[in-house]
């Protein structure tokens, strides 16, 4: 129960993270903000049952990075450490997706096989391409997130990391979904034409 509640609360906090950091920095509430983040990220690191998969690895890695940044921020009394969290999240996602390019099935292919275990060769090539596109997205997103940190403009940092990066991600997801629907329709048509 506590684990489920902390996971849900952490998801909300992660979505609102840029705005919470902006609020905490401008209100001088670093102790409250840092303490709250340490508590939430710490709860996310608690052991859970089941198999340790890549999604659990990702969640724990993100929580570990968040915990470390919050601790350093509190100890050094320097809020700028908190600004690096979106950069590290993009880096972790890049590692997860890129690593799968050297495995028999990419991450996107494994997700696609949850809906259709018998993917045709063209769909497998497509999922590899989508995985590569996501890798490119995480490189660009991480670079832009780092740029907002280095520019030192909290409003710009909050705007990009709290809104624009999500809009870019949603646009990529939506565009990929439309492209996938076209591919599925084309594959269905070619399958029907191939039948005697």
For the regions a protein language model found, what residue spans apply to each?
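Hydrophobic alpha-helical transmembrane segments of multipass integral membrane proteins
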Residues: 11, 15-18, 38-42, 64-71, ...
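C-terminal membrane-adjacent module
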Residues: 117-196
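N-terminal membrane topogenic signal
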Residues: 1-10
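Long, highly hydrophobic alpha-helical transmembrane signal-anchor segments
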Residues: 48-90, 146
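Structural signature of hydrophobic alpha-helical transmembrane segments
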Residues: 24-37, 163-166
């Amino acid at each position: 129960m506590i684990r489920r509640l902390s996971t849900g609360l952490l998801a909300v906090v992660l979505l609102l993270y840029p705005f919470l950091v902006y609020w905490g920095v401008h209100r001088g509430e670093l102790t409250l903000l840092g303490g709250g983040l340490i508590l939430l990220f710490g709860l996310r690191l608690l052991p859970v049952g089941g198999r340790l998969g890549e999604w659990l690895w990702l969640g724990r890695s993100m929580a570990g990075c968040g915990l470390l940044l919050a601790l350093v921020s509190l100890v050094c009394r320097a809020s700028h450490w908190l600004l690096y969290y979106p950069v590290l999240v993009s880096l972790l996602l890049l590692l997860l997706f890129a690593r799968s390019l050297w495995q028999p099935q990419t991450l996107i292919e494994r997700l696609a096989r949850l809906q259709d275990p018998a993917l045709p060769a063209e769909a497998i090539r497509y999922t590899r391409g989508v995985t590569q596109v996501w890798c490119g997205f995480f490189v660009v997103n991480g670079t832009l997130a780092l740029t907002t940190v280095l520019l030192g403009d909290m409003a710009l940092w909050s705007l990009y990391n709290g809104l624009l990066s999500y809009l870019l991600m949603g646009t990529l997801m939506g565009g990929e979904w439309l492209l996938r629907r076209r591919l599925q329709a084309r594959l269905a048509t070619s399958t029907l034409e191939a039948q005697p």
